[in-house]
Amino acid sequence: SNKGGLTGIPTGYRGLDDITSGWQPSDLVIIAGRPAMGKTSFALSIAKNVAVDYHIPIGFFSLEMNNVQLVNRLISNVCEISGHKILNGQLDNTEWERLDRKLRDLTGAPIYVDDTPGLSVFELRTKARRLVREKGVKLLMIDYLQLMNANGMKFGSRQEEVSTISRSLKGLAKELNIPVLALSQLSRNVENREGLEGKRPQLSDLRESGAIEQDA
């Protein structure tokens, strides 16, 4: 259904949605950054907005964190409480009440997490098809692209393998007719450039493959 005039899946971030009109069917969307710059946190915030606020089913493939770690991060995001405080139970009465209230919102939210380590792009395609067929998933999220592999194929370099993965994800988005969001690492080049403008990421900074900027 149309969400606030958007034609695609809303992110919950008005400025971004105004620019994109939501993520469109068959889109491959890349969220890129250097390590520890908040890519996963941003993706989880979007996941919360999509699944909890809009009740749109999503599939989240986490190659970096296991299921427990990811759920803890999601709870922290939804409740706006430090994950460390939640893990240690160091909450005041107001925070306990907020945790209880927000967990009720989160319980039953259509978020389907797969934390299979070392997932190949071919395994992901099989799992994604099943999620769309059985759960009605409308958005796939992958954390993160460079942790995937293309087992069963031979490549002259890692760059060629990542290019194949990127093209496969774009093909999957088109086949399933849903947006696929993949997190991606940036190369060190962005850190080696001088000045504020020099630190601004460029498409050429996408790590291990120039194909990502063409497919997304």
Pin down the residues of each PLM region.
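N-terminal pre-Walker A segment at the start of P-loop NTPase domains
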Residues: 1-18
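Pre-Walker A (Motif I) flank of P-loop NTPase domains
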Residues: 24-29, 56
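The conserved Walker
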Residues: 35
